[in-house]
């Protein structure tokens, strides 16, 4: 099987670029996509992002999380280095945990139009409480909409112990 041709990757500009510029403000425009070579089948793509940081909008204190992003692609897929830089752009962004996860999901839906996507943030405790917002989306009118409902109802049936962070 042949790999991808350079012309297939013309819109992927950050991967392999030695002059990467790190943005310090929320920057959804940095996200890049490439074509899904297997749109005829369902499969999950999962990103584990253990170095997410943002700021509390009230106190300005830093918040830290591992974010899990899973999606079933349609025609387009997010390029991982652009995703890394996008997530890094939240470093000085002041928003609540729940808002950050929904913003990330909405930006990825707008970018890729996936069949299904879920974003789960597992934030480290602050003040003795950890917050783990989960959001998902299934394309309306399809089996993925039903899948989203099912996964939402069952996403956290077995709460974890806090010692796993």
From Swiss-Prot:
It holds the Pfam family QueF. Its EC number is 1.7.1.13. Substrate binds at residues 78-80, 97-98. The active site is at residues 56, 63. Keywords: Cytoplasm, NADP, Oxidoreductase, Queuosine biosynthesis. GO terms for biological process: queuosine biosynthetic process; tRNA modification. Coiled coil: none annotated. SUPFAM superfamilies: Tetrahydrobiopterin biosynthesis enzymes-like. One of its GO terms (cellular component) is cytoplasm. InterPro entries: GTP-CH-I_C/QueF, NADPH_dep_7-cyano-7-deazaG_red, QueF, QueF_type1. HAMAP family: QueF_type1. Belongs to the GTP cyclohydrolase I family. QueF type 1 subfamily. This is NADPH-dependent 7-cyano-7-deazaguanine reductase. It comes from Bacillus mycoides (strain KBAB4) (Bacillus weihenstephanensis). The lineage of its organism: Bacteria, Bacillati, Bacillota, Bacilli, Bacillales.
């Amino acid at each position: 099987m042949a790999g991808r041709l350079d012309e297939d990757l013309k819109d992927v500009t950050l991967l392999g670029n030695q002059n990467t510029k790190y943005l310090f403000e929320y920057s959804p425009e940095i996200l890049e996509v490439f074509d899904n070579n297997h749109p005829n089948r369902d499969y999950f793509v999962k990103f584990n992002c253990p170095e997410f940081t943002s700021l509390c909008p009230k106190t300005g204190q830093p918040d830290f999380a591992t974010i899990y992003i899973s999606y079933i692609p349609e025609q387009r897929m997010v390029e991982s280095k652009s995703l890394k830089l996008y997530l890094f752009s939240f470093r000085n962004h002041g928003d609540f945990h729940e808002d950050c996860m929904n913003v990330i999901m909405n930006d990825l839906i707008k970018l890729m139009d996936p069949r299904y996507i879920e974003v789960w943030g597992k934030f480290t405790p602050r003040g003795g409480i950890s917050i783990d917002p989960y959001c998902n989306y299934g394309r309306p009118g399809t089996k993925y909409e039903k899948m989203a409902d099912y996964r939402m109802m069952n996403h956290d049936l077995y709460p974890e112990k806090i010692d796993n962070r």
